[in-house]
Amino acid sequence: METGDSAVKSSQDVHYYGKSTAQKHRRSNGIILIFRALTFSFSLTSVIVMGTNRHRIDAQSRVAWYDFDPFRYVLAVNAIICIYSFVEIWLAVYTYLKDTLFLPETFQVWFDYGHDQGFAYLLFSANSAGIAMAQLLQSGNSLIHGAYRCSDAGVFCTQARASIGLGFGAFLFLALSSLLTGLRVARWYFS
């Protein structure tokens, strides 16, 4: 009797594509873990690149990332995303290894989705402000310390753009994570 019951149960669990619900959840959790790790890597690299962006223009003048508010915004938001992604990686590893959520399902599903959405918008906003400032500096419409062009500051503008580009990479993977957590919300809500 037990073997018959388990055969019926396993045939009900298998979807017509041949994957069980548990296998699909495990694969989904693995993909989310990869996206979280990529978000963390890109945001951490962006923080490092922007945080080390200091150059000497001449004997008396130096330019640094903290001289420009948009670049401060880029660094601060990428640091926040880095910390958030680290926590989410820990939660994703826990979920992947234990096959269960760390927090109650209702809370964790909405926590992940809401924070992914909010932080993705924040990250996009910061990078957009940063790229606008970098473009103004590069075009010469705004001068460094009111007197110097980007060409006078070595690789300062290029390094700022690289950091912002890495921030957009973090945004891409955070947006993909948000898409998957949104699907998780829909699956939870309609099941």
Curated annotation (Swiss-Prot):
Subunit structure: Homodimer and heterodimers.
One of the Pfam families matching this protein, by short name: CASP_dom
Alphabetical UniProt keywords: Cell membrane, Membrane, Transmembrane, Transmembrane helix
InterPro entries referenced in this protein's UniProt entry, alphabetically: CASP/CASPL, CASP_dom
Origin: domain of life: Eukaryota
Principal location: membrane
Transmembrane domains' residue ranges: 30-50, 73-93, 117-137, 163-183
Official protein name in the record: CASP-like protein 4C3
Regions of this protein lying in the Extracellular compartment: 51-72, 138-162
Cytoplasmic-side positions: 1-29, 94-116, 184-191
Membrane topology designation: Multi-pass membrane protein
Presence of keyword Membrane: yes
Homology family: Belongs to the Casparian strip membrane proteins (CASP) family.
Protein location: Cell membrane
GO cellular component: plasma membrane
Upper lineage: Eukaryota, Viridiplantae, Streptophyta, Embryophyta, Bryophyta
